[in-house]
Amino acid sequence: MLAEVAGCVIIERIAKFARYTNLGDRRQVMLIGFSVGNYKSFKETVTLSLVASSITEEDKELDENNVFPINDKLSLLKSAAIYGANASGKSNIVAAINFMKWFVLNSSKETQVSEAIDIEAFRLSTETEKEPSFFEIVFLLEDKTFRYGFEVNAREVVSEWLFQSDDSEEKMLFERDFDNYILDDFPEGQGIIDKTRSNALFLSVVAQFNGKISGKILRWFSKTLQLISGLEDREYRKQTLESLENAGHRHDIIEFIKKLDLGILGIDEIKINIPPPVFFISNNTEKYGGSYGNLYPNSETKTTVHVHTLHPKYDADGKQTSKVLFDIEKHESEGTNKLFALAGLLLDTLRTGKILFIDELDARLHPLITRELICLFNSNETNPHNAQLIFTTHDTNLLSSKTFRKDQIWFTEKDNKGATDLYSLVEYKVGKDASLERDYIMGKYGAIPFIGNFKELIGELHE
């Protein structure tokens, strides 16, 4: 176990180089909570809440850095960690919000006209297998709180709703029950009902017709809400490469890599233009007049980027004599490749105050580095725009490092019928001197695997 250490090692050094855009008050684009029910392993509706509870921590820095106030009634958390055994449903939280984002952005497209909705209800109960799946998200946008959700099955949108509130009470903008709509205070939706298919979201269709509120909400889903897998570097490596084109962002990325003590002095990219073949075989019947399999001139040149890291080379006296280029994919570790891929996205999220979900954040990373990445978010200095990080993890060292408040720690656990529950550590009475890591490993909070007797298995194999 790591020693219990308050604070982060490289926070001060990171803060010195980070260039944050002056975006004003970024509190108004934050996530408040997300709920899902009857989806994958979630039979009942569960809620992941980023609302800070009324608890106070013994370490006051956690309260000062990990929480930001919105108003007198609401404070939000800058990060949340989700723990659980393998196959307990941790990743399904990320999958659920990823589906919601995808459906909001794509359901109204013509390509989805005749397509079934790719939804997976909880399959281990006769009660739910034919019922719709439930999704709801609550978020801040331009000083207003929006609560948007829908129920959907493979054929159609069963219900949909949008509510808005500011300092006053919550008011309904619209509600939908199959093909029945109520538009109380949503003028941009007038005349759009007949244009909304049964398998498309009303909000998405209204946004296509330049609805002001709906357009802002879709941009929030598209630009502010980000989701990635910590196991698939290729998904987000492109953003780091694009960020290297900006001089300021390039400096930040290189400094970020250097501060993590990876033995890297710098980054160099080599762009190679791959000449096209003189001809190619067409399989695009519309573009090429209905022909198929004919040869056509090809003028498209493809560019590939090879990233190299710079390492110092020393003589026998330990004096640096030169620098050596390493191909990052061939010569660097999986962890270094992941950190390079993450760098652009992490720094952009902090720079612009976005929301980032990462499934398996700690995969291929040293526990100390994982902690440092989290500390970048749990800091007023390096996270002045109140970006939010929500991630799944197996790294129990984080529980001993005084990194989180109790309301930032979440668990997933399956019952004996295969249904996942999601709950927070704040629901438990935890003593001031309690070792969260030890108590979690010992099963005090649940969400651990129940492992069978392997000795019996080995004995059977030898019989």
Regions found by a protein language model. Name each.
Residues F34, F135-I137, V157-Q164, V305-D315, ...:
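Short polybasic amphipathic segments
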Residues G37, E235-H331, F454-K455, E460:
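Extended helical coiled-coil dimerization/tether regions that scaffold
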Residues F146-T285:
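Electropositive, glycine-dotted interaction segments
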